[in-house]
Design a protein with these regions (language model features):
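An acidic/histidine-cluster motif and surrounding catalytic segment
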Residues: 1-118, 126-156
Length: 156
């Protein structure tokens, strides 16, 4: 489900909803549900402060429905990208994306806003599945999986 709660950056919700479906299908989660809210920088800054104790907006936040322990167990599986955990078909969680921040990052990285938003959607879904980048080994694992999926999904 896509919910656009901001007005500063125009978004085409239907193509983004379809792309979310492609991400979930690629991960063998076609029946799973994810909600993505596009929020203002001000709202994202508040959430970033409340949930991560960091000042200012970030580009994406994920709020997994899976317990951390079960998500970690799934993320450590070698076949995690192609095998669904017990929760497949259920609600994976919520993702918040700040399009204004995404637009700044897109410009800085030479990408289109549409491409940046899709990359953030993928990144957020991986977090919902338990992947993380808090340690070097976690970062390496998540980056490998994300790069593989970016290629499969046609993202630069």
């Amino acid at each position: 489900m896509i919910l656009n709660r901001q007005k500063k950056v125009p978004l085409a919700e239907q193509p983004l909803s379809e792309f979310l479906g492609k991400i979930l299908q690629e991960l063998n989660f076609a029946q799973a549900e994810v909600s993505i809210a596009f929020v203002s920088d001000a709202e994202m800054a508040k959430w970033n402060r409340d949930f991560r104790h960091k000042n200012g907006p970030t580009d994406v936040l994920s709020f997994p429905a899976l317990s951390k322990r079960r998500a970690d167990r799934h993320a450590k599986r070698k076949d995690a990208v192609v095998k669904s955990p017990v929760t497949a078909g259920g609600f994976l969680g919520d993702i918040a994306i700040a399009p204004q921040t995404a637009r700044r990052f897109a410009r800085a990285n030479g990408r289109t806003l549409d491409n940046e938003i899709r990359i953030l959607m993928l990144h957020g879904v991986l977090h919902l599945m338990g992947y993380d980048h808090e340690s070097k080994s976690d970062l390496g694992q998540m980056n490998r999986i994300e790069q593989k999926l970016r290629r499969r999904l046609g993202l630069a």
